[in-house]
Amino acid sequence: MTDKTSLSYKDAGVDIDAGNALVGRIKGVVKKTRRPEVMGGLGGFGALCALPQKYREPVLVSGTDGVGTKLRLAMDLKRHDTIGIDLVAMCVNDLVVQGAEPLFFLDYYATGKLDVNTASAVISGIAEGCLQSGCSLVGGETAEMPGMYHGEDYDVAGFCVGVVEKSEIIDGSKVSDGDVLIALGSSGPHSNGYSLVRKILEVSGCDPQTTELDGKPLADHLLAPTRIYVKSVLELIEKVDVHAIAHLTGGGFWENIPRVLPDNTQAVIDESSWQWPEVFNWLQTAGNVERHEMYRTFNCGVGMIIALPAPEVDKALALLNANGENAWKIGIIKASDSEQRVVIE
């Protein structure tokens, strides 16, 4: 019998001690997100959450998302502190457009080699996003998978569950001719279109860390965290008759607005009602991107579009702007049997 070296999990590239160190590092920030409905703490096999008692006929709303190749840009620039906010935003904003209050959030973090500092920065960002949206970070999975990812590269996914009163679900069915469209300003490209962003950076030869735009590095514009609209929109829904809300993500104006429009209606967008933030002008110029493609790929400064009756517009704008949103009238709904569901003019 020959002597053999005793192998460990760490020899195979999985460091359990690093995983435990990460849990110890993030416990404090995770605890700050706790809602009263959450039962138990971190470490259980599953997270328990009661439904808020104020709901008579509660309907659960779920969603999952990632941040796409914005993650690659963040890794290249070694800036990991806001990517977690992006992750939460992409999920909770999708829930609130249906009238749902986010309850709890879980994350999945996968990497080839776990770097505790990087993972801690990402998860701290997730906790910050949960605080901004009023939901609890109740658990997650950190997977160290050597051979699956290159070095310390990582990927993230988020999962969120919210609740809405059955009679108050917002599904677009109330949208009608004459409704007014209100826009909520975005913080930048949010988390969509980054494969094109990175291609533009490559073709233009631009260094986003040294190129300045509006007095700050282009990198700051490109990595600005996705705006979380939850608290402003939930208050709006309580006080105003909201007919539909579209979250402008992948597919931009052309694909997201029609998702909330009933048959025989058309959204008419007034392009003169706002100016694109400089980052979108830069992207269009540097990449020689056609206008139609810009509106299909990016939000162009508009994170959400809300449809409501004309008499509610002034009240809605006052509420939204008082809550720190940049809100304005961007268009109207018209009766139409055209196959073109969105017109930008």
Swiss-Prot record:
GO terms for cellular component: cytosol. Pfam families: AIRS (PF00586), AIRS_C (PF02769). GO terms for biological process: 'de novo' IMP biosynthetic process; adenine biosynthetic process. It comes from the Bacteria. It catalyses: 2-formamido-N(1)-(5-O-phospho-beta-D-ribosyl)acetamidine + ATP = 5-amino-1-(5-phospho-beta-D-ribosyl)imidazole + ADP + phosphate + H(+). CDD domains: PurM (cd02196). The keyword rRNA-binding does not apply. It is an enzyme of class 6 (ligase). It comes from Escherichia coli O81 (strain ED1a). Pathway: Purine metabolism; IMP biosynthesis via de novo pathway; 5-amino-1-(5-phospho-D-ribosyl)imidazole from N(2)-formyl-N(1)-(5-phospho-D-ribosyl)glycinamide: step 2/2. Belongs to the AIR synthase family. NCBIfam families: purM (TIGR00878). Its EC number is 6.3.3.1. GO terms for molecular function: ATP binding; phosphoribosylamine-glycine ligase activity; phosphoribosylformylglycinamidine cyclo-ligase activity. PANTHER family: TRIFUNCTIONAL PURINE BIOSYNTHETIC PROTEIN ADENOSINE-3, TRIFUNCTIONAL PURINE BIOSYNTHETIC PROTEIN ADENOSINE-3-RELATED. Coiled coil: none annotated. This is Phosphoribosylformylglycinamidine cyclo-ligase. The lineage of its organism: Bacteria, Pseudomonadati, Pseudomonadota, Gammaproteobacteria, Enterobacterales. Keywords: ATP-binding, Cytoplasm, Ligase, Nucleotide-binding, Purine biosynthesis. It is found in: Cytoplasm.
